[in-house]
Amino acid sequence: MKLCGVLLLSLCCFAGISHAAQINLATLTCVRYQNEIMAPPVPAPGADAINTMMWLFGYSVGKSGAHVMYGDALAGFGFALDAECKNNPAMSLLDALATIKPDNKKPMDLTGLECETFASRHLELQQSDRESADTIMMWLFGFAVAKTGSHLFDSSGLKDFEASLMADCKKNPGRNLFDELVAVKFSAAKN
């Protein structure tokens, strides 16, 4: 009997891990997002709620058509998404994201930042604070996925995206970061 319980628990953990690898924003309800992604009973190894939220934030901005990064708006975005999901638990996460309008204080226009400048700053940040560099890259990854028209979150694609973006910035140093994020080719999960 104990063996059956252990097997059942193991299967649930593996299901959570595989679910966390790819998330369909159009079919995931707010209540499932809050219970299974942001506060799972058994967290998936390597899961990072901040990076997931950062990806969603970048995705939301990219989907809105804006071409700016809001440096001080992550907390406000997270609280607004949480409130929207609590008020509308059956709403899809994709629809909830469309309702959130980030605080637009201190916007950084991505059309005003050259790839070369971004790439050198990113490399410096990787040396001093890898975690922060990854968090910023997650925002850019979410933004770029939104620009492809996909509505799938797959955190395993971050390294491929980062390598493609950095290689393209090396090839096109004078291109602005917004144009590069729209043009970069990476293996985005397909709808």
Residue ranges and their predicted role:
Residues 6-15:
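Bacterial N-terminal signal peptides
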Residues 1-5:
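Positively charged n-region of N-terminal signal peptides that target proteins for export
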Residues 23, 39-112, 118-191:
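Compact alpha-helical subdomains of small soluble proteins
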Residues 16-20:
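Sec/Tat signal peptide C-region and signal peptidase I cleavage site
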